[in-house]
Amino acid sequence: MHQEPHVLNFGKAGNGPTITAGMALAIEPMITRGSAKTKVLADEWTVVSVDQSRGAHFEHSYAICPDGRPFVLTSPDGGKAELARFGVEISDLLA
């Protein structure tokens, strides 16, 4: 379903792949109330915590536009309202 590059939700800045214009990224953080250790079930899709604690998962899809700025494909306003709080300007795809 997803293509390269595989970008982890954790790590040190500057050590992963370079994100460039033309990429589409699925950002999929997961959190659990207990152990951070997880396993994938036999269906090769379902992820559970090893201690069976409750968890949550959500996804947003981003396009990196030709101007190098992001556009959130899963947000009606392209992510403008939420990303502005962090000083991030989105691409002008809605203009």
Task: Give the label of every model feature segment.
Residues 1-6:
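Short, basic/aromatic beta-hairpin or loop at an interaction surface
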Residues 11-95:
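Charged, cofactor-coupling segments
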